[in-house]
């Protein structure tokens, strides 16, 4: 007899998406939920919250998930609640009025590419400052009615969630996103199927990417994900993690963003005037754009003229190590088919990504490729412009760093997103009615001086109380999960003083951010935080990259210090720094502190967000604060570096922090006089809002991009593209002609009134004459005298004197100028020859230089 008590097969699961069944009267709620306009609209959030405050909190303020989980009977009742329907209709009316406005077609249209977007904590496609900036940019583009579309990647797991063990060790957790519960929608084709882009990754295979759309107000953000059953087990995870995996997966992601992104726009029939690479990750858009023009009948040189003329590259990192470099073998594995499509050699393609063309040992750098295929390049602050000019100087060796064309637009923040509701109401009640449309107008902001001090102070106290409640709630949950001793938790909150000055520090934990600086002299810090006359507390938050052991060590060190008896309740580290935590921190603390190594902070925007909430900044003069600092409106550590020795400099900066806390900041905060607040502290707040805030809004940033880059790019592109690309073809031919004759050009003679002597008299002018055989180039070159001076360990331009072409005899051109040096000292002089053409946007566009 056969006997068995076990017979079970494997379930054949299939995915089923059950949509929320809203009563017809409430369908407007779903429409609003699927547009991220709600992320910066307080009335919408209040509408959802009032329906079920507990559920709204439970779903982490995700309206799509909220409508899925809310009790259906409650919805039916609400559909017949006249008061609620009235509120909903008012919000929906405002939404439709906003959305239905046509974009401004008088301004150039933009295609924007970024690896990450920080739009809301609900949509986990961001990790840090780059994403925050990109998310804010889309929101302001929507508010400013700009014709812009964006491309990014949709990550299944996003960036990691952080938890801390009892001893402060960072633990990385990844939670899969359910795309059906996010404020995104599938991009559908006429046949009713989701649009899928087939991206070539090598000659032998393609990767299939699903296309999604997130509506950011009026702006469409198209997102690609590779979790498609048509893909292999090796390719489905390409978009699982933001900045996850090895260098091979990073390259796969960047191919998807750049090449796949352009293929997506083509499939959707979208063309724009300007293509903006937000960091080098997106640079491969220009590979695909070149291919498209070449497929249309142009050659490589002609296509490059058009691509360059309509491309902008924004660099965010201030150090060479922060850029993506790929070994030639790896790059060849995925890109070997492109030289044939472009009509160039493999070495030609590699050289587009090298500082030193022809150097076989040099890897392919996306940032270098971006510089060489984009007409315009910009840093993200005034100081970062100079840093970037130095960093990219090897690409344009014929020019000194300060001469190259790298510009800047200082980052700003989206005011409606980061300004707390109470502050927005205060501004709305007291400022000009056009305030939100004219945020860069300092005259409007100066109305803050007319707001009573008590109102300013009470608004600050409300935000601080909200933060303290948030901290207690968050820590209770986090510490329970990590099994922190309950007695320790009680002791921390017993010693926490709600009336103490509160200083916040929140950012990515990389060593150059110097989170450890405050702890340089532990004994002195203990005296400061335990001074009963001037109580002060510090709140830290931030994630370290999973591969950054030093950054994780800093977190562990701070957590360990915070558990010491003298620091209990005085220093707290909050885990899992995300947009929600950031929003509470930057509005609730009294001071926002930032202590990076000098020239290591490209811009930084967290301090700008704090600024919009009446929080004062205390920072190194780097990034945005180098431009923003005003006396009596915050505090600064000097931008000067005293010691080359990093340890000595850290000690000096720590001393400055302690001194300013003890002698300036704390006495000012507690100078109550006869009131329950410090009048001088409120004066600092008003100065900060009136004098600094108007210069760091995203509205100002967007306007700057148009004024400094988009307008001229669009104008130049349309000149080249007119009449079937006539001038693009002409410029390509002209450059080819210059290349072929350049080495043959002869310098026939150089004459100078001083006889080219090494010693000349200060202030005495003399004539310089240069005769050149241009070899048939027909006045296509320029000559200039370059005088340099050695200062600060480097050679810098003292003066550049252009020589004028005064006569021609066959191919012989005579150039003359009057020269002279009006300061005594040691100088160097040389002559520089370069190609010239009225259609060149700048010299680095065609970087041919001969020194003589």
Q: Can you say where each PLM-predicted feature lies in the sequence?
A:
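Catalytic cores of carbohydrate-active enzymes across secretory and cytosolic contexts
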Residues: 1-852
């Amino acid at each position: 007899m056969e006997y068995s008590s076990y017979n079970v097969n494997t379930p054949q699961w299939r995915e089923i998406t059950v949509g929320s069944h809203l009563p017809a009267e409430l369908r407007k709620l779903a429409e609003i939920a699927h547009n991220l306009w709600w992320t910066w609209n307080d009335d919408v959030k209040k509408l959802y919250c009032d329906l079920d405050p507990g559920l709204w909190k439970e779903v982490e303020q995700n309206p799509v998930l909220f409508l899925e989980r809310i009790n259906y009977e409650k919805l039916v009742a609400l559909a017949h609640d006249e008061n609620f329907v009235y509120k909903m209709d008012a919000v929906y009316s405002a939404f439709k009025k906003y959305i239905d406005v046509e974009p401004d077609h008088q301004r150039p249209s933009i295609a924007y590419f970024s690896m990450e977007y920080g739009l809301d904590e609900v949509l986990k496609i961001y990790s840090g400052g780059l994403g925050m900036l990109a998310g804010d940019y889309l929101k302001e583009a929507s508010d400013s009615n700009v014709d812009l579309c964006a491309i990014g990647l949709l990550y299944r797991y996003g960036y990691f969630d952080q938890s801390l063990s009892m001893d402060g060790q960072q633990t990385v957790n990844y939670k899969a996103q359910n795309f059906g519960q996010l404020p995104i929608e599938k991009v559908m084709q006429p046949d009713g199927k989701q649009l899928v882009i087939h991206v070539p990754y090598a000659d032998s295979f393609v990767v299939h990417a699903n296309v999604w759309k997130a509506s950011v107000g009026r702006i469409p953000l198209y997102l690609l994900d590779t979790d498609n059953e048509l893909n292999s087990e090796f390719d489905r995870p390409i978009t699982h993690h933001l900045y996850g995996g090895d260098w091979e997966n990073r390259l796969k992601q960047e191919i998807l963003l750049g090449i796949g992104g352009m293929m997506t726009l083509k499939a959707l029939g979208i063309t724009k005037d300007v293509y903006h690479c937000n960091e080098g990750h997106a640079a491969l858009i220009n590979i695909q754009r070149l291919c498209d023009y070449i497929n249309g009948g142009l050659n490589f040189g002609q296509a490059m003229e058009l691509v360059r003329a309509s491309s902008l590259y924004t660099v965010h990192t201030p150090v060479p190590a922060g850029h993506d470099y790929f070994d030639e073998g790896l790059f060849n594995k995925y890109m070997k088919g492109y030289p044939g499509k472009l009509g160039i050699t493999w070495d030609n393609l590699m050289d587009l990504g090298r500082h030193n063309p022809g150097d076989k040992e040099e890897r392919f750098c996306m940032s270098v490729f971006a510089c060489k295929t984009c007409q315009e390049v910009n840093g993200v602050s005034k100081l970062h412009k100079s840093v970037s000019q130095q960093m990219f100087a090897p690409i344009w060796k014929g020019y000194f760093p300060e001469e190259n064309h790298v510009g800047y637009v200082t980052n700003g923040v989206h005011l409606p997103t980061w300004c707390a509701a109470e502050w927005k109401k205060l501004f709305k009640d007291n400022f000009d009615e056009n305030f939100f449309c004219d945020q860069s107008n300092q005259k409007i902001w100066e109305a803050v001086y007319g707001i009573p001090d008590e109102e300013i102070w009470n608004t600050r106290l409300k935000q601080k109380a909200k933060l303290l409640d948030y901290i207690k709630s968050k820590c209770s949950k986090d510490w329970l999960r990590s099994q922190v001793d309950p007695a320790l938790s009680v002791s921390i909150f017993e010693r926490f003083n709600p009336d103490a000055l509160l200083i916040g520090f929140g950012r990515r934990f990389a060593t150059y951010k110097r989170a450890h600086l405050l702890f340089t002299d532990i004994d002195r810090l203990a005296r400061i935080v335990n001074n009963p006359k001037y109580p002060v507390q510090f709140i830290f938050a931030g994630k370290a990259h999973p591969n950054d052991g030093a950054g994780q060590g800093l977190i562990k060190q701070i957590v360990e210090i915070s558990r010491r008896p003298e620091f209990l309740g005085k220093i707290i580290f909050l885990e899992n720094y995300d947009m929600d935590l950031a929003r509470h921190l930057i509005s609730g603390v009294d001071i926002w502190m930032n202590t990076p190594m000098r020239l290591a902070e490209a811009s930084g925007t967290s301090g700008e967000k704090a600024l919009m909430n009446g929080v004062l900044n205390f920072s190194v003069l780097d990034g945005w604060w180098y431009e923003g600092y005003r006396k009596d409106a915050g505090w600064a550590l000097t931008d000067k570096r005293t010691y080359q020795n990093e340890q000595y400099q850290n000690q000096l900066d720590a001393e400055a922090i302690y001194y300013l806390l003890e002698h300036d900041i704390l006495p000012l905060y507690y100078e109550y006089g006869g009131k329950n607040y410090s009048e001088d502290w409120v004066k600092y707040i008003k100065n900060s809002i009136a004098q600094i805030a108007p210069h760091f809004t995203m509205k100002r940033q967007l306007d700057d991009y148009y004024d400094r880059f988009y307008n001229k790019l669009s104008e130049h592109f349309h000149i080249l593209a007119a009449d079937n690309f006539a001038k693009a073809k002409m410029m390509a031919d002209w450059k080819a002609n210059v290349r072929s004759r350049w080495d043959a050009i002869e310098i026939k003679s150089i004459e100078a009134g001083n006889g080219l002597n090494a010693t000349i008299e200060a202030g005495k002018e003399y004539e310089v004459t240069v005769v050149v055989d241009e070899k048939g180039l027909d006045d296509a070159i320029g000559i200039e005298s370059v005088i340099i001076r050695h200062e600060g360990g480097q050679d810098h331009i003292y003066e550049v004197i252009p020589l004028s072409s005064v006569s021609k005899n066959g191919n012989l051109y005579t150039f003359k100028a009057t020269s002279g040096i009006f300061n005594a000292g040691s100088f160097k002089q040389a002559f520089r020859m370069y190609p010239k053409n009225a259609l060149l946007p700048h010299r680095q566009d065609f970087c041919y230089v001969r020194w003589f």
